[in-house]
From Swiss-Prot:
Proteolytic processing into mature chains is required for histone eviction during spermatogenesis. Transition proteins (TNP1 and TNP2) are required for processing. Testis. Residues 1-40, 67-102 are annotated as: Disordered. It comes from Pan troglodytes. This is Protamine-2. The keyword DNA-binding applies.
Length: 102
């Protein structure tokens, strides 16, 4: 899921801020070196910060690939789906524990 911030109609667009930033002298990525005023610092943090996050669920294509590999050998199953996210496994379909080949 990707979360975006909705801009209010009274708020200027990102292009206006970009023009203001490029109009001033730019040093490194520090906010003081760019000469940003306090309200521009807030805008800079909002537009260049890490407020956007992506949540990646197991896609159907990936799940299908995992299930396709499963029937090769029932004993040596590779558990790849959501291995890194063991607590929040609700987004993925859980596989059956028993072998369905018989």
């Amino acid at each position: 899921m990707v979360r975006y911030r909705v801009r209010s109609p009274s708020e200027p667009s990102h292009e206006v801020y970009r023009q203001q930033l490029h109009g001033q002298e730019q040093g490194h990525h520090g906010q003081e070196e760019q000469g940003l005023s306090p309200e521009h610092v807030e805008v800079y943090e909002r537009t260049h910060g890490h407020s956007h996050y992506r949540r990646r669920h197991c896609s159907r294509r990936r799940l299908r690939r995992i299930h396709r590999q499963q029937h090769r050998s029932c004993r040596r199953r590779k558990r790849r789906s959501c291995r890194h996210r063991r607590k929040h496994r609700r987004g993925c379909r859980t596989r059956r524990r028993t072998c369905r080949r018989h």
